[in-house]
């Protein structure tokens, strides 16, 4: 299946790559095309600006921006595009990632960034798919099946618990 739009997964450093694997896995699971790039808001700001300004023209529909510490990548990318930007704060050695979370979530009016949990790459991938599903019924159906499957697993766990409680 070919989608009109793809997801850009931008990471601030190659050390963030293991954390974003969950986003890659979820995007692949739902059949959403994606590309990954390493761009630093602080070390390569011109590249961040260039990527963001041209993302829509290059076929992207959503940007996931993953960074730790002074995690300004999502905000910098959001400043130069009208595409939805999902900030993925990465746990750092300082404050267990709280510094990253606050850097991503505290955006000024007019420059919104959707934010997932610290190291919440699975949810970043799912949220990106949900955004694209607004204009793709097949993708929306796959997401609905995924959510139904999660509900079924909860129901099964509850049934097992109820059986255990009877004994």
Regions found by a protein language model. Name each.
Residues 51-89:
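Glycine-rich phosphate-binding loop
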Residues 5-43:
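Glycine-rich phosphate/diphosphate-binding loop of Rossmann-like nucleotide-binding domains
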Residues 16-20, 44-48, 67-76, 95-98, ...:
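Short glycine/serine/threonine-rich phosphate/pyrophosphate-binding segments
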Residues 36-57:
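N-terminal beta-loop-helix "entrance" segment that forms/cooperates
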Residues 95-141:
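Short, glycine-/small-residue-rich phosphate/pyrophosphate-handling segment
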Residues 132-167:
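Glycine-rich phosphate/pyrophosphate-binding loop and the adjoining helix
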Residues 24, 49-52, 79, 96-108:
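Active-site-proximal loop->helix
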């Amino acid at each position: 299946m070919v989608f009109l739009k793809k997801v850009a997964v931008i990471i601030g450093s190659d050390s963030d790559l293991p954390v974003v694997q969950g986003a890659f896995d979820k995007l692949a699971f739902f059949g959403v095309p994606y590309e990954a790039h390493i761009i630093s808001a602080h070390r390569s700001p011109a590249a961040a600006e260039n990527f963001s300004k041209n993302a829509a023209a290059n076929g992207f529909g959503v940007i996931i921006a993953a960074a730790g510490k002074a995690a300004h990548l999502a905000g910098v990318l959001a400043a130069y595009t009208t595409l939805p930007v999902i900030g993925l704060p990465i746990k750092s050695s300082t404050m267990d990632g709280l510094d990253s979370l606050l850097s991503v979530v505290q955006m000024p009016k007019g420059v919104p960034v959707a934010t997932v949990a610290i190291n919440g790459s699975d949810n970043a991938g799912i949220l990106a798919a949900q955004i694209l599903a607004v204009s793709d019924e097949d993708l929306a159906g796959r997401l609905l099946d995924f959510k139904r499957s999660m509900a079924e697993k909860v129901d099964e766990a509850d049934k097992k618990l109820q059986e255990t409680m009877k004994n």
